[in-house]
Amino acid sequence: MTSQDVILGILMKRSLSGYDIKNMFETVFSYFYNASFGTIYPTLSKMEKEGLITKESVIQEGRPNKNVYSITEEGQKHFKAYMYSPLQANEFKSDAMTRLFFGEFIEVEVMIEYLEYGVSSTEDDLERLRKMYENGKSNSLMSQTQEICIQIGIENMESTLRILMAGIERLSHLKMEKG
């Protein structure tokens, strides 16, 4: 899966501005796909040159022109080829998990702080994902497969929260024992 595949999928439903596409990467896709802001616009430019998308400049009064991107027939073929291609293994990288794995080499208090940070950031992400889910359900904007995807994200975050909180409790007991 590449940023190009995700952008083509986004444009399968409707034409969007670069800003709207970037916003979807930062909200909807941020839970399972990581694309930096600096890759989106160069990818759009490359895709336009390859004939996968077209760009239309929309004139706006008092504001800069807006570029709206649409998928071409060639882009649709490319996207469908991606959708039917074999699944790739999931890639998971986590600085927090790496530090936790090697946590025996630093103070327990620091590891507890890391876990507490994990709780806080996961709670924030979970709240945003739940709002996204409720908004999508109430506005009938989500397909069944999108609903399943978001439900998986919610369940994963809830499970992560339980483990993080239990970890804080375990390390707090360890800290008291070493006391």
Language-model regions, residue ranges each:
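Alpha-helical scaffold segments that form or flank carboxylate-/histidine-based iron centers
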Residues: 39, 67, 144-154
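Long amphipathic alpha-helical coiled-coil segments
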Residues: 171-179
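Basic helix-turn-helix/winged-helix DNA-binding cores
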Residues: 1-92
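Amphipathic alpha-helical dimerization/coiled-coil segments
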Residues: 81-124
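Heptad-repeat amphipathic alpha-helical coiled-coil interaction surface used
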Residues: 112, 119, 123-126, 133, ...
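Acidic interhelical loop/turn segments
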Residues: 131-150
